Amino acid sequence: MTTAAAPAKTTELRLFPVSIESFDARLLEMDLYLKPAPDAPAVLYRTTGIEFTLQDRQRLMEQHIEFLYIPMSQHKAYRRLLSDRVEETFHDPHLQRVERARLIRASCKRMIEDVLIFPNQPEPIAMIADMSRKFATWATEDPQQFSYLLDMSGHDYYTTLHMVSVGVGCGLLVNELRPGDEELRTALVEGGMLHDLGKRGIPAELLNKEGKLAPDEWQTIRRHPLIGADELRNNPAVPAFVIEMVRDHHERPDGTGYPEGLRDARVSFAARICAV
């Protein structure tokens, strides 16, 4: 059943885009809006409590609709949906390991994209915190399966998938160095997935530039750890440990890192883990 309505007044209702691949067959716990055309206003598509089916998803894809829109006020319900889905995927014995890894990494990629799209919003950061707790549990519950998320990593260091990979790697490394410390493991996974938050505003052509950077370009790159840390500092739910990790992940014990050129013990354990 499709519920039509007048276009959503975006001045009153803040919406965020969600890939339709995020949805599987289930009873909706949130309202869904869609845009009939890229520049068209959003209209109500399904209301809370109505079933969304795989056939519905397929029909939308056939109409070349890639995104649905959810009210920001219902972000917590979307967090639950995505969290439940990745949990089910990780433990699904019917999925090949490669497919499990692909689905989980794709979900985490979307979570990080939400953080980048909506700066200074607590809801997307809370979703990363939820996922970090799952990663921390998986790292000890089934380290072999969890490590496969890292095995799927590529080599593009300026993508959200790279940030997912760093979060996975931090979880694995801390599990080896500090086994049993779940709080630390969770914090470092979160820091790993957020470590390059400050690169949001840097043009892709600069991030991917080959060869030596001009002095002004280098200064732009050097500032990204401080920019990311400053943004997270505005969110009281983010642990200080995570903020420190984001700020210092390019520092090196010999003083050759940036942005401050910290040396020796001034480079925190968290920053060293992220650097690896």
Model feature map: region roles:
Residues 5-7, 105-276:
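Histidine- and acidic-residue-rich, metal-dependent catalytic cores
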Residues 1-160:
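Non-catalytic interface/linker regions that flank or bridge core catalytic/transmembrane domains
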